[in-house]
Structures are given as C-alpha cells and as structure tokens.
C-alpha cells in the first residue's frame, strides 16, 4: 500500500464555521519536517489569503475549497434568478463566478501558471 498524500489536522475541517478557524502552524511545521508525503489542508472555509499563504509556505501542497466554491455558485444563482430563468440560463453566471474565485485562489496558493 502506498500513501500518496496526507491530510493534516491543524485547525480546519470541512464545511462552514461559526467562528474563524485558528491554525496551528507550529504543528504544520512539525509534520512537514517529519514527513516527505505531500500535505493536504482539508477545509479552507473561513481562512484569509494570508492564512492560505502561510499554509503553503509551511508545506501544504493541496487545499480543498469546495464549500467556498459551492457558496459562490449559490450566490451567483441567487443574484441572477428570476421566475422566468431556469438552471440552464443561470449556468454562465455560476461558471463565471466560480472561475473568478478559483483563479483568485490559484494566485493566492501560488499555483497559477503551473498546470
């Protein structure tokens, strides 16, 4: 069996938070120093751009932001919804909103231009 990546528990989890998560960057540094496996941050909800940058600098290789993108899509649908507009007509607005946020996160994570 091969472990390809490792999700670390440093103060985040999946979903929306009632309060801003508190990152344990010392824990991240310890794990990153002891492990050669790429590290994953589960649950980026509530983190600032600076928090994400600190995580990447500390050794995080993959960040999950589904909840953020899901809420972005829902907001775009809500903004453009009318009684005469269906899901098909909403998709361009949703796609553009999620694309915009994804490109922003790629710049923050330092992954833009690398695919």
Predicted regions and their residues:
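Glycine-rich tight-turn/loop motif centered on a GG-T
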Residues: 13-25, 62, 79-94
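Glycine-rich phosphate-binding active-site loops on the catalytic face of alpha/beta enzymes
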Residues: 10-14, 59-76
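Alpha-helix-loop-beta-strand connector modules within alpha/beta enzyme cores
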Residues: 20-41
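Hydrophobic faces of well-ordered beta-strands that scaffold small-molecule active sites
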Residues: 6-8, 39-43, 61-65
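Catalytic cores of alpha/beta
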Residues: 44-58
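Short, small-residue-biased leader/transition segments that mark boundaries at the very start
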Residues: 1-3
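Extended, intrinsically disordered, low-complexity segments
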Residues: 78-115
